[in-house]
């Protein structure tokens, strides 16, 4: 049975989202929570029912790291450290909200360790996925987590 695989890179402003239908990357976008919910309601559920496909989400587990962030430069200003910790906390809350959304729809969520794969390496991303459209670091990261779901 084929699946709809959703890759997610959680963020406080807009999540990187990648959708694989039947093993092929079809949607790559940045979306906020409401946009993602609309996509689930208007597309994923219908496609899942029409094709008898399961939906599975593969997400970067930002909750798996400590919010007490140590800067590379130990002499970094305390305000910089606090701002970084705040951003990590916001991303963690975003992940919690995403998981609640998927739980509401009874969609299976698989968490993956944080990875920088494909964030910077656009050429490798395009070679593996055959994606020719626009992408950014967050959407490529989401595509990577979705790709991990294809390989399971």
Task: Set out the residue ranges of the language-model regions.
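Phosphate- and other anionic-substrate recognition elements at nucleic-acid/protein interfaces
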Residues: 2-152
